[in-house]
Amino acid sequence: MTIRNFNYHMTHFVISAPDIRHLPRDEGIEVAFAGRSNAGKSSALNTLTGQKSLARTSKTPGRTQLINLFEVVEGVRLVDLPGYGYAEVPEEMKLKWQRALGEYLQKRNCLKGLVVLMDIRHPLKDLDQQMITWAVAVGTPVMLLLTKADKLASGARKAQLNMVREAIIPFMGDIQVEAFSSLKKIGVDKLREKLDTWFSEIPPEVMIDEYDDEEGK
């Protein structure tokens, strides 16, 4: 397989949806970003794409209640899933979000990979582990980003990284763990490389359509 280098700076917003029934057709390739409400998910997407406001960051955790789709090129999408685990959100709404997350991860056929973001100081909370379990159960590879890595000194950062790598072994899945910081750009290259690898497995018919469109210009 040839690894393509995608230009994530060209990423643009497509649609917001409350559940998978309101998403575009289940085709092409999607990589989803998931994490607790204060894990830095929106900041990571903005850093990856070089766009300060592509994914809205909020001072109030839990504001992202919809599935947000962004297109890199035709047939290649990044998906910002609702943040989870915020204590002040009503229980009924929490359950609704969790159902939407589980349904997306288990039923969306074009989902190629899952990026789970966790604060490096508080990794692998119950809901983080649930996301990993759902992904592994359907054979979806996972990248765990330990965010806010700049908050720890180098030694403590490496210790947390090694601890999480050991802790995820029992999940028996295709899981890569990296330290990440939107502020200091730590781990951004590794995220980009992983996305390029996943997206390079895009179905041939989509690649042909894209090539034909460019030839016709």
Curated annotation (Swiss-Prot):
Q: Which GO terms describe its cellular component?
A: cytosol
Q: Which UniProt keywords apply?
A: Cell cycle, Cell division, GTP-binding, Magnesium, Metal-binding, Nucleotide-binding, Septation
Show the InterPro entries listed in the entry.
G_ENGB_dom (IPR030393), GTP-bd (IPR006073), GTP-bd_ribosome_bio_YsxC (IPR019987), P-loop_NTPase (IPR027417)
Q: Which residues bind GTP?
A: 35-42, 62-66, 80-83, 147-150, 180-182
Function per UniProt: Necessary for normal cell division and for the maintenance of normal septation.
Indicate the family of this protein: Belongs to the TRAFAC class TrmE-Era-EngA-EngB-Septin-like GTPase superfamily. EngB GTPase family.
Protein name per its UniProtKB record: Probable GTP-binding protein EngB
Native species: Yersinia enterocolitica serotype O:8 / biotype 1B (strain NCTC 13174 / 8081)
